[in-house]
């Protein structure tokens, strides 16, 4: 049987970075196996449904380059579906679930439960006081057929629960974790169908995975404790269970599960900050999977060729934003200046440095600006911090060293010569920037750091930074002269 895998998110909000990794691993395994990757929407919990979440998820996955073969898709501006195993939205499959629930009831592997919320709360409170594991106490498990009919005819609300056998070991093999065994004494009779007629995740996922011929279930480790119930459902229906892969959690630096309280966790957050899709995908692939060699830079095609489930880790991987920035910075440096300029323009507008008309009229100049900063940013939004030296009328002295350099005795001499050279120049380009320092050195006898460092501080306010000839080209004659005058005044005020 050919490989078929699925990513099955719930439309409850933003796409978590962990969800992107789950989708990515499913996609990569399908590609490596010449199989199919399906995207199914699990919206059985209608109380948590968020309008627009499906569309947002599809946009995030398209941005990341994680494309599915079957499932929910955009057809123009609206949602559609493609594939032969649909519907791919669970709320459109209610009749299918009812059919298979009737089979389960008929076989005696499920039962009606008429317990009220108040009774269930009392049971849980009693279990808590007595130090027992929380779970359903089986109150409705052995109702007679007549009692059930009477309650149904009276219109009593109900749910349908899984009837687990008593004291039975349920075993399954996980490709990452090996053999897993759990006894039904440690499980409770899970609700399979809610009172609103919607199935719970545990029932719908088994029916859907079977009918869609899913061969491998690749999902987060939070589903590991529920898997014995799913395995038992396959057994109850007489179906062959898929192979399971439970992925390790993505952790914060303190090794707790990645949380929005401690930083960005939504794919949209990274997109807005100007991370490149290839940078985020490359990095997130490495959080929980280790390649055979020490290489850390992988294109999507290289990931498709190298990925294997056998090299997925059991233990959680730490999300290291510094490592992400290093990987993403690599892709920024490898990108064309046009691409990064186009991505940078909204951030420069947001910072108030340029207007939309500036973006069109001064595009070539903006490309020059970006080319100066491109190898100094880890994500595109960072350009807002770095670009101020080209827009602010006054320099800002960043540290003690820059403040000391602005007071060196020979600085006025350097500024006098630099000012004269700039005023005499027909154009300030990179060639001018390279030649002017040789001329200043020749005329003043000042060279090396004593020449370059003070002038860099005058032009940028910083001791270190991009190549000075490039900086001068982007600043242009007026800005250079304005800064020289500003520093003249600054020197006078310090006396």
Curated annotation (Swiss-Prot):
Motif 'KMSKS' region mapped to chain: 257-261
Locus of motif 'HIGH' region: 9-19
Gene Ontology cellular component annotations, sorted alphabetically: cytoplasm
UniProt keyword list: Aminoacyl-tRNA synthetase, ATP-binding, Cytoplasm, Ligase, Nucleotide-binding, Protein biosynthesis
GO MF entry, a single one: tRNA binding
The protein's enzyme class: ligase
Catalysed reactions, semicolon-separated: tRNA(Glu) + L-glutamate + ATP = L-glutamyl-tRNA(Glu) + AMP + diphosphate
Keyword Protein transport listed: no
EC number: 6.1.1.17
A single BP term in Gene Ontology: glutamyl-tRNA aminoacylation
Function: Catalyzes the attachment of glutamate to tRNA(Glu) in a two-step reaction: glutamate is first activated by ATP to form Glu-AMP and then transferred to the acceptor end of tRNA(Glu).
Subunit description: Monomer.
Sequence similarity: Belongs to the class-I aminoacyl-tRNA synthetase family. Glutamate--tRNA ligase type 1 subfamily.
Name recorded for this polypeptide: Glutamate--tRNA ligase
Lineage: Bacteria, Bacillati, Bacillota, Clostridia, Peptostreptococcales
């Amino acid at each position: 049987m050919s490989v078929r895998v699925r990513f099955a998110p719930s439309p409850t909000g933003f796409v978590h970075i962990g969800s992107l990794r789950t989708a990515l691993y499913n996609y990569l395994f399908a590609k490596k196996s010449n199989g199919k990757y399906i995207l199914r929407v699990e919206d059985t919990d209608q109380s948590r449904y968020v309008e627009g979440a499906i569309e947002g998820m599809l946009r995030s996955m398209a941005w990341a380059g994680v494309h599915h073969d079957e499932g929910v898709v955009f057809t123009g501006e609206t949602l559609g579906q493609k594939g032969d195993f649909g519907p791919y939205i669970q709320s459109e499959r209610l009749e299918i679930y009812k059919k298979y629930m009737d089979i389960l009831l008929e076989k005696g592997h499920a039962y009606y439960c008429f317990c009220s919320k108040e009774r269930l709360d009392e049971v849980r409170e009693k279990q808590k006081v007595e130090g027992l594991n929380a779970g359903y106490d089986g109150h409705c498990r052995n109702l007679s057929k007549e009692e059930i009919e009477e309650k149904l005819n009276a219109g009593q609300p109900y749910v349908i629960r899984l009837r687990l056998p008593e004291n039975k070991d349920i075993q399954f093999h996980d490709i990452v974790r090996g053999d897993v065994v759990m006894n039904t004494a440690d499980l409770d009779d899970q609700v399979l169908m809610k009172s609103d007629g919607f199935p719970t995740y545990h029932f719908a996922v088994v029916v859907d995975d079977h009918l869609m011929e899913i061969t491998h279930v690749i999902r987060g480790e939070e589903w590991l404790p529920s898997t014995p119930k799913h395995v038992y459902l396959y057994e109850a229906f007489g179906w062959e269970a898929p192979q399971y892969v439970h992925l390790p959690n993505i952790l914060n630096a303190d090794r707790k599960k990645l949380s929005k309280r401690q930083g960005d966790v939504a794919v949209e957050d990274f997109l807005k900050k100007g991370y490149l899709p290839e940078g985020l995908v490359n990095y997130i692939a490495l959080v929980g999977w280790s390649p055979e060699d020490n290489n850390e830079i992988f294109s999507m095609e290289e990931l498709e060729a190298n990925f294997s489930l056998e090299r997925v880790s059991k233990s959680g991987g730490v999300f290291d934003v510094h490592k992400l920035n290093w990987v993403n910075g690599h892709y920024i440096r490898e990108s064309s200046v046009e691409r990064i300029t186009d991505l940078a323009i909204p951030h420069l507008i947001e910072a108030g440095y340029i207007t939309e008309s500036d973006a069109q009229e001064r595009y070539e100049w903006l490309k020059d600006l970006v080319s100066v900063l491109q190898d100094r940013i880890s994500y595109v939004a960072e350009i807002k911090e770095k670009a101020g030296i080209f827009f602010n009328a006054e320099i800002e002295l960043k540290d003690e060293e820059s403040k000391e350099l602005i007071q060196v005795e020979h600085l006025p001499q350097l500024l006098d010569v630099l000012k004269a050279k700039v005023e005499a120049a027909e154009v300030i380009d990179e060639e001018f920037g390279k030649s002017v320092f040789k001329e200043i050195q020749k005329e003043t006898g000042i060279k090396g750091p004593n020449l370059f460092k003070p002038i860099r501080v005058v032009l940028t306010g910083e001791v270190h930074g991009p190549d000075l000839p490039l900086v001068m080209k982007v600043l242009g004659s007026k800005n250079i002269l304005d800064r020289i005058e500003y520093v003249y005044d600054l020197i006078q005020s310090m006396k």
